[in-house]
Structure formats: C-alpha cells, structure tokens
Amino acid sequence: MKLEINNAGALRLARGQTLKMLDAAGSTICAREGTVWITEENSRKDVVLSPGACYRVGKSGLTLVQAFADASVSLA
C-alpha cells in the first residue's frame, strides 16, 4: 500500500493500513478523520484516537498507528 498526503498535509491511511514509526518519542499524532489505534513497544496500554484527539508518543522504539476505517493523521 502506498501512503498519501491530503491537501491539508495529513497522512491518509486506508482501512487496516498500519504506519510504523521508529524512535518517535516526543512526536504528536493527531487524528484528523476516522479513528486510529496506537500501540507503543513495551507499553501496557493502547490508545484509540477519534477525530480531533491527539497523543504524544512517550517511548522510543516501535510505535504502530492503524486505521480502523479510512482515516487521516497529522504528525508533529
């Protein structure tokens, strides 16, 4: 699957598509459209973001962001 960036600069994820982020501690992930699931390596909690919600990655290592349905996220 290819990654797309929409006109607002958000990364589009198709349903079920997973974004792998390495050593992203301190990065902020914001759901712009759709709902996404986030899990961090060696963390006991997972996070689900609805549109408008943001999450700051707290750990280095692997972070996965997966779209439940078509979604878009911004990264900062």
How would you label these PLM feature ranges?
Residues 4-5, 40-42:
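Short alpha-helix capping/helix-loop boundary micro-motifs
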Residues 13-14, 32-35, 69-70:
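Glycine- and small/acidic-residue-enriched microsegments that form turns, hinges, and capping elements
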Residues 9-22:
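Regulatory nucleotide-sensing modules
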Residues 52-76:
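C-terminal structural segments of small proteins and small subunits
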Residues 25-26, 43, 61-63:
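Short, charged beta-turn/beta-strand-edge "cap" motif at the junction between a beta-strand
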Residues 19, 35-38, 54, 72:
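Short beta-strand segments in beta-sandwich/barrel cores
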Residues 24-36:
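Glycine- and acidic-residue-biased ligand/ion/polar-headgroup-sensing regions
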Residues 10-13, 43-58:
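Short acidic-glycine-tyrosine-enriched beta hairpin
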